[in-house]
Amino acid sequence: MQIGKYQLVRKLASGGMAEVFLAKAAGPRGFEKTLVLKRILPHLAEDAAFVEMFLGEARLAAQLEHPNIVQIFDFGEAEGSFFLAMEFIDGPNLRKLVKRAAEEALPPAFCAKVVAAAAEGLAYAHEFRDVETGEPLGLIHRDVSPDNILVSRQGAVKVVDFGIAKVAGQGHRTLTGVVKGKVAYMPPEQLQAKAMDRRVDVYALGVVLYELLTGKRPFDATTDVSVMQAILFESFIPVSARRPDVPVALQQVLDKALAKDRERRYADCRALQDDLERFVLSTGEPVGAYQIAQRIAQWVPEVAAAPAMTPSQGGSKGAVASQAKADARSASMVSPPVDSTSPTTPMPRSLVAPVEVPADSTSPTTPMPVAIGGVVQALEPRSSPQQDTLQSYPVVVKTPALRADASARGASRPRAQSRASGVKVQAPQARDEDVVAMAAASSPPSGGASPAPTTPEDADDAVHTRSTEYAATVPSGRPGGRIAGIVGAVVALLVGGAVTVMRGDDSEVSPVRVNPPPLTHLPREPAVPSQGGRNVPQEKPAANVNAGARDSNDGAQAKPQVSTDVSVVPQEPHVARDATTPEAGLPTVKDAPPENGGAASKEGSAVVAKREPAKASGDPEPNPSRVRERAPTQKVAAVAKGRLEFRIRPYAVVSLDGKVLGQTPFAAVEVPEGRHTVRLVNKELGKDVTRTVDVKAGQATVFKLNLEAE
């Protein structure tokens, strides 16, 4: 998925205001930079006042450059959504370490050092002055929490989202409880909507330090309301009550940082940093970037990467463009598509036939004929620098003698075995006049299905059991002795037929007689319109098929007569995509008039494959052979749909009709109209709620629920 000039790799996190993605920015000559993209959620992007405030704060935060602050590189808009491009930190946030602390106590010196580094970054922001006027800006973070402090695997501590929380905390934009746990880090003056200063961030850092030491929050409260009551009117639980081994000096730092009266609190983050650094020095333990990195590697050994994004998933988990291209390349090598309406690369001057075989990755440019159930098919090559050379020579394909019993065995063989046998390709010969025209194949055994697909839908199944015989000729003259044309049509699914080799030296055309096994005996059916618009008769008496060929050099004619005692039904010939496209530079196959004989056009004209319809033999007894027609495709009426958006407070994993959609927030989804069952799960709150929602076609429905009130 692309956002502006950035390619999304995978989703990292989501919150009440935005969702965060790992992204890449590409440049010339292979330049590439990994960064993080934070995209504002659509419902906030629709508020012009919010966007204006957010843009102003983004400009301000972009000026902050400090080792302990995540740097902002870019701000932009794409597809109606605003985003920030910022520095990528390879490592966890402190929330993961808090969870670790609930299981195993973290060293006090380590906790103090990490919080001191965050305090240094915040102190820099608090003291930042306007570049033009030199006046202090009085910038306050207002949203310090373990989620917004990151620790890289190199031991660097970084404060993120500086300035964005200030926008969210303005007046009517205080989204209490939307981002989980934020209320727990607010001092009393912030909850009372009093004037705030940098001591707001001091209090929040004190709560973060308390959690790192104990794995718990300072108050035993579970809801936002009870937490607010505790912050305003209750004393926090002493850290010594939960962890007696915490040194007294560090307990005193916590008492001062968490004072309800801000006048008794540290005046700024710089003062808090100083006391924490003194404590670290007093322990006598070296705690620097190297020691922090070692601890992170020990406690958080790996960060599981989400699956790369795919184009169809959009903003959900999943892929970069290079991965999508690689998947596309792999798919094209496994099963090249067959499109009969829009040709792409012209076929080389070898064989033209319907294609539905995997490409050989070892030889991607040479057309490789493959025998599938007795039908020889050639693989269309991909374009390559060697293609012109390959197209300059005819490719002669030699097939073994066709026998009814051999063809039946080939049809009953597994597809993988059939593909690997029956065809040999020899190197180009010196004679340019040699051209191979393949116009026949054996039928499947009784009751079997023919394996010769003609459209992508028919690639893995075949239901036709028709048979007929054709002969085709090819113009063989061309200035310079080169081949003027090649065979443009190969009839698919033929019971009887011949392999005719036509030469440009006036040699006769000699079809080879094949005696196929009888067709499948099916019950009597009424006449069914065929693909060509003709009616398929119920009875199919024996037919005589006459095919003619004319040499384009001197007008000499050769009219071999081929007849079988097998009942046949006329059928429109199946030809490859490029054989029917004039601009592909290849011969075109057309229906011939019903009279006997046929002629090939002169040099440069199209090849005409002629056939005659079946003629009744006068036998009163109907032939039991039947034509098995594909049932007409029924178009399914489109289901009316509407859009459903989920606004859950604080968040939840949403399932719709038993299918998991993901964790909120996420974009609105398109669902069929009607009543649906919604399940919301929030493990942190211990909530599992099921509701129903009615969706109307063509309308947007918003599902709102506050899980904390449930």
Curated annotation (Swiss-Prot):
One of its GO terms (cellular component) is plasma membrane. Residues 332-348, 439-456 have a biased composition (Low complexity). It catalyses: L-seryl-[protein] + ATP = O-phospho-L-seryl-[protein] + ADP + H(+); L-threonyl-[protein] + ATP = O-phospho-L-threonyl-[protein] + ADP + H(+). Autophosphorylated on serine and threonine residues. ATP binds at L12, A13, S14, G15, G16, M17, A18, E19, V20, K38. Keywords: ATP-binding, Cell membrane, Kinase, Membrane, Nucleotide-binding, Phosphoprotein, Repeat, Serine/threonine-protein kinase, Transferase, Transmembrane, Transmembrane helix. Residues 1-482 are cytoplasmic. Sequence repeats lie at residues 337-348, 358-369. It is an enzyme of class 2 (transferase). Residues 308-349, 404-461, 507-634 are annotated as: Disordered. Residues 504-710 are periplasmic. The active site is at D143. The chain crosses the membrane at residues 483-503. CDD domains: STKc_PknB_like. Residues 337-369 are annotated as: 2 X 12 AA repeats of P-[VA]-D-S-T-S-P-T-T-P-M-P. Belongs to the protein kinase superfamily. Ser/Thr protein kinase family. This is Serine/threonine-protein kinase pkn6. It comes from Myxococcus xanthus. The gene is pkn6.
